[in-house]
């Protein structure tokens, strides 16, 4: 990480009330090194510029920590891909128990590689479809927080996420600048799955287009029939 990108990461997070030490900055640097190397073979991200990676991936992920008064006791990330937002949050909060769900084998291999490189603990990768994970009794209604970035439209994402949350837990769903259409289309899914949109926050990252964070709170148990079989939520949204 160049001095300028390290300064951007440290200064911006400090402005947000978050603190990064030298070890964490070194972990972020190694993370980007591995991402850029693996990206040449596996196309993990369309972003190639290192400074843009800091803004669009690292800072965009770390912004989610601003909504917590204290870190959650458990987090599961859906469709983790290259690890955003969960891996930056894990680096920020080393004690946070994290589960990454990634159905694509090559991406899951990359995630395990980065976890080993960064010597992260209390974190695991599930190379499974999210519909299968959501019907697993050991995972279902277990988590305080679900994160998912660029996975699906909100009404589909709700069927993936809400079965994993315990009552009072939260889905953090980064969205574009105007998520109102997605929220309106998700009202039936919210009613069926036991959730409500509790906040929609503006997200501002230096030199990036404004976007938003939709927060959904689980308010009632999710019926056992959800999530439906693999592929059905995306093909037939609620």
From Swiss-Prot:
Function: Specifically methylates the N7 position of a guanine in 16S rRNA.
GO cellular component assignments: cytosol
Primary location group: cytoplasm
EC numbers on record: 2.1.1.-
Protein name (Swiss-Prot/TrEMBL): Ribosomal RNA small subunit methyltransferase G
Residues binding S-adenosyl-L-methionine: 79, 84, 102-104, 130-131, 149
SUPFAM superfamilies: S-adenosyl-L-methionine-dependent methyltransferases
Entry-linked InterPro entries: rRNA_ssu_MeTfrase_G, SAM-dependent_MTases_sf
Molecular function as annotated in GO: rRNA (guanine-N7-)-methyltransferase activity
Similarity remark: Belongs to the methyltransferase superfamily. RNA methyltransferase RsmG family.
Pfam family, one: GidB
Catalytic EC class: transferase
PANTHER family: S-ADENOSYL-L-METHIONINE-DEPENDENT METHYLTRANSFERASES SUPERFAMILY PROTEIN
Localization terms from the record: Cytoplasm
Swiss-Prot/TrEMBL keywords: Cytoplasm, Methyltransferase, rRNA processing, S-adenosyl-L-methionine, Transferase
